[in-house]
Amino acid sequence: MKHSTLAWRQTLASLPMVGLIYGLTLVLGLLVALPMYSTLTTEDQRSLTFLNLLHGFDYTVVSDFMNRSGAAVKAVFGLVRWLNLTYLFLTVFLTGGILLRFAQLSSLRARPAGMVSQFRAELFWDGCSQYVGRLFRLFGVTLLFVLVTAVIWLIIGILVGSAVSSSETERETIGVSLVFFALFALTTTLLLCIGDFAKIILFRDDAHGAFRAFGQAGRLVLRNLPRTYGLYLVFILIGTGCFALYFVLESLLTVDGWLMIAVLFVVQQVLIASRVTLKVWWLGTAYSLVQSLPQPVRQVSAPVTSTLSTESAKEDC
């Protein structure tokens, strides 16, 4: 708990960084939202039929519109695939800068009270660019393990399903499928948790071996499951709770005009900002945990608060 509390204070001290990341996310969203809005306003031909959608989903209206203007809309949807790839790249790219920020704050904790470490964008971008290559290799390693476990669970699920399908009812077959899906979900989240801790190890040791860092992180997580994976699941539940709250609010709001559309937009942006904050908070918590937990493998190089974070600490002092 103390690591989460410390990381939360450091996250609050890094609100300019959180705002920068949120701004980049907003820009990416607008790159699709604006063309989509332009396409819809052009293709609707000022039809009043679309007003029916304010009172709830109307399949007939949507189906007629897609039959008439599906090609134009699908062209915009093609941008979504590129947006997802860009967002994925941005997520990996920004990780180095986020970790550098927490390393900077951790190295300056011994300063006199009242002194604060100012966020500097140029140092943040330097951290992003310095670690992006090795973090992408680590992303590839994590994805490889996720795909392998997915194939393994799929094969086991098919074998078990075919063995019980002849003797069990449809409901029981679905139950077996849900059990294997839950096992796959737990395995995947465990691998993603290990991947996040591997990022910290790569950063801390200034290392380049993605497989080696993943192995070290795996041993670290498995030896401290409640403090690592357990806490990771708590953060997932917090994020899930935020989405559930949004859907509850959306169901309660009657979107019947521009005012309510604006209110819903604000609620959505608050949700996105909270998701960004939660991601930064988790990385800070994981960084603090790695610094405090006993290491399963003897470190090869000196612990890194990175040349960049060391230089920034000297400048702040």
Language-model features, listed with the residues they occupy:
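Short membrane-interface loop/juxtamembrane segments of multi-pass integral membrane proteins
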Residues: 64-69, 123-131, 216-224
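Membrane-helix interface motif
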Residues: 38-43, 150-166, 249-253
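Loop-to-transmembrane boundary segments
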Residues: 129-141, 221-234
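Polar-ligand-bearing catalytic/cofactor-coordination segments
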Residues: 102-103, 215, 314-317
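Hydrophobic transmembrane alpha-helix segments characteristic of membrane transport
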Residues: 92-129
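Alpha-helical membrane-spanning segments of integral membrane proteins, especially the hydrophobic core
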Residues: 73-88, 119-150, 171-185
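Juxtamembrane transition segments at transmembrane-helix termini in multipass membrane proteins
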Residues: 2-71, 94, 175-209, 225-317
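Membrane-interface interhelical connector segments
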Residues: 160-176, 207-214
